[in-house]
Amino acid sequence: MREIKEEYDCLHIEISEYIQSPEKTLVEMDAKQEFAFDLYFKRLPVFSNKIREVLKKISIDAYTKIYQRAGDNIRASGQVNSSKFDESKVFLFPSTINKIIKSAHHMARKNSGSCFIVIDAIRNPYEAIFFKERYAGFYLVSINTENENRLAHLRSAHKFSESQIKELDEKEYPSKLAGYSKFVSQNIQKCIEISDIHIHNPREEQFNNIELKCQLAWYVSLIQHPGLVMPTSLESCMQIAYTVKQSSGCISRQVGAAVTDAEFSVKSVGWNNTPQGQVPCLLRNAEDLLRGQDSHAYSEYERNDSKFREVLHGKYDKLRKSPLLEGRNLSFCFKDMQNEIDGEKNQVHTRSLHAEENAFLQISKHGGMKLSGGILFTTASPCELCSKKAYQLGISKIVFIDPYPGIATRHTLLVGSNSPELQLYRGAVGRAYHQLYQPIMPYKDELETLLSIPGNANKKALRTKALEKENLELRDELERLKSQLESLKNEG
């Protein structure tokens, strides 16, 4: 580390002076922007590569581990060497990146050039939301591949061992985050869930990435020029599933599903929610249950079981009057409470139907129709139970976004003679679907304006010209007839 210590100290002094330097005049502001551009786009990338190489000499995964720990600490405290939580520092990373973006825009304007920014890479969902709230043209892009391809890449390209891969997965795909860890830790699964555009990188051939390039070209073109092409059938159907998930009353996560026939004609939609007639968890209140109010919203078990009410009282009695609620509903998760009572993790206790299950049941509820050969779209991926239902119904393809951390794929679906095809979703969803595929002006109007194609405004002139031509022809015909008539008179 000695080989980079001197350079680090010099950079640290320069950055400290840069932060403290005044920016009261346009000249001072311009100087700071130019310094920031030179620092972040030219000098720091070179220094960062030096750090990477030094850390790799320590161990294969030293760079990843140290940078992940440093990132968590900076989000928590604003300092690399402290994990003490300070809520004012949560958005330090995106705030700094935002300043870097402004310096790039400044230099682009100064040089009369264009400016397109790519941030590689965002692994904290709240940092993504920071940019979504500030830039209408921000798109969170997830590049996904099958898990087998991902593992093979980590083993071959990064030389990771199985234990190192497991440790990396536990860090980037945490099973459960509590407290302030939700704000400072990496959570790639949540980032995938809120992504605007999903790109599929098959990684089937080491030196052939044409499929990846084609997808990137498609969406970069649409970002720069919305409405150039129509959405694919996959995108249209997944957008429906993505839209209906907002109807979910689950307080843990929202999932949507759509079932179509083989021609992408939608037959049913569903979302994770309680059965019809039961109140969703989002609308239930622990205070109401403790006070015995709104009894139809709670089960006989919740109202009368002494052990359950003891746990409920211990968790929520002091919280129901908390000023921090500020009008929020004090909802609670029955599954979590029951699992705490039983001392185990059991998904059976969930009150909600799964989105895929709900979509299947909606079809039978309203008369039924053939689903064999159909396609299931889900904004998550089906669990073991929903996978068995899809298999039994003869679903031929399952299109999913978020890989489920279970054995549904390998155990439940990839078995027997009628296994459905599993396809990672590629396409735009949510806000991006509308922004990318809705043209700013009708394409015909755009071409007419761009190429000066004569439009409807010349119709009157064209009609006048046609009438004038017709009038001349009629005059000629009249003169001919007059001449013939004169000849006949002379002969008589």
PLM feature segments, named:
Residues M1-E3:
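Glycine-rich phosphate-binding P-loop
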Residues L11, I15, K24-A104, Y180-F183, ...:
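Zinc-dependent deaminase catalytic domain
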Residues S95-I101, C115-I119, E127:
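N-terminal helicase ATP-binding lobe
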Residues S103, E127, S156-C214:
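Small-molecule kinase domains that catalyze NTP-dependent phosphoryl transfer to phosphate-bearing small molecules
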Residues S114, Y135, Y139-L140, M369-I375:
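Short beta-strand/loop segments at the ligand-binding rim of alpha/beta enzyme cores
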Residues D120-I122, F131-H158:
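Conserved phosphate-donor/acceptor-positioning beta-strand/loop module used by diverse small-molecule
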Residues A121-P125, S381-E384:
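Short beta->alpha connector loops
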Residues F138-L140, I197-I199, I398:
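Short, well-ordered beta-strand core segments
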